[in-house]
């Protein structure tokens, strides 16, 4: 039924202008606006929609993962742009917030609304 449908995901934010600045300027993503919705244009022709929600509650899980060739370099660049990395109990993270346990190297951070994002080495 949906084999030829170009599905997309979406998530909420309380302030679309603030989200546009963060995703466009801080993260460097291409963005556009469609009917008061923020569209994030991701690599590979994928789009994600950010919609306004006044009674917003941040996601308690990772909503977007950004695969990178060098997670340490990405963390350093994001830190220089004012991004702060999260620390989670039960995960042994280094001084930069990078988890170097099982699986790929990964570091989590939040957008201005408190939604969880991650960079992971691929």
Model segments located where?
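N-terminal beta-strand motif that seeds the catalytic metal site of vicinal oxygen chelate
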Residues: 1-18, 61-64, 120-122
